[in-house]
Amino acid sequence: MRLTLQHITRLKVLLHLAGFLPLLWLILSVDQGWFSADPAKDIQHFTGRMALKLLLATLLVTPLARYGKQPLLIRCRRLLGLWCFFWATLHLVSYALLELGLDHLALLGKELISRPYLTLGVISWLILLALAVTSPQIMMRKLGSQWQKLHNFVYLVAILAPIHYLWSVKTLSPQPILYALAALILLLFRYKKFRQWWR
């Protein structure tokens, strides 16, 4: 069955709910004390995993649209990318406020040097920031051919973000490995484009 614009509109509503409802759960979990004895870590991990899931979902759209012969699915990609940026921003803010605290934000630079996995995370966030700012149609028209070159940097985020996660947990636990494998598989779908981008 070929998806119609009406189907895509309904799908977008569901995707918005998928991006928003976990935020309500997070707020409720904090309010009700459902997290472990280290809620700051739990919040950081939850927001980080949400950002990573949405990044993978964003990368999944193109293969689904191409191989599933559903070109209208591409219209969902920007929505997922913006939700990914939203959760990545929550992840960064939760680290800055809960780990460092308002009184110690000046230590962030020192933290980035002493903990390289943080550097990877911040680089990923800066790329996502650039992609979010330039995602509207008006920016696409202004940037012209440079727009696609800029947005190809999402592939770099797909490499850096799983490494950031693996490195931050400091153990070879299954979950970050699965995220890394999923990112690798999605990048393999773009092997030719990815190779051209690095030339």
Curated annotation (Swiss-Prot):
Cofactor notes: Binds 1 FMN per subunit. Binds 1 heme b (iron(II)-protoporphyrin IX) group per subunit.
Pfam family, one: Ferric_reduct
Main location, first listed in the record: membrane
Keyword Nuclease in annotation: no
Transmembrane segments: 13-33, 79-99, 120-140, 147-167, 169-189
Membrane topology: Multi-pass membrane protein
Any one cellular-component term (Gene Ontology): plasma membrane
Compartments, record wording: Cell inner membrane
Cofactors (names): FMN; heme b
Family annotation (InterPro entries): Fe3_Rdtase_TM_dom, MsrQ-like
Molecular functions (GO terms): electron transfer activity; FMN binding; heme binding; metal ion binding; oxidoreductase activity, acting on diphenols and related substances as donors
Keywords: Cell inner membrane, Cell membrane, Electron transport, Flavoprotein, FMN, Heme, Iron, Membrane, Metal-binding, Transmembrane, Transmembrane helix, Transport
Biological-process GO terms, alphabetical: protein repair
Role: Part of the MsrPQ system that repairs oxidized periplasmic proteins containing methionine sulfoxide residues (Met-O), using respiratory chain electrons. Thus protects these proteins from oxidative-stress damage caused by reactive species of oxygen and chlorine generated by the host defense mechanisms. MsrPQ is essential for the maintenance of envelope integrity under bleach stress, rescuing a wide series of structurally unrelated periplasmic proteins from methionine oxidation.
Quaternary state and interactors: Heterodimer of a catalytic subunit (MsrP) and a heme-binding subunit (MsrQ).
Identification of the protein by name: Protein-methionine-sulfoxide reductase heme-binding subunit MsrQ
Organism: Pectobacterium carotovorum subsp. carotovorum (strain PC1)
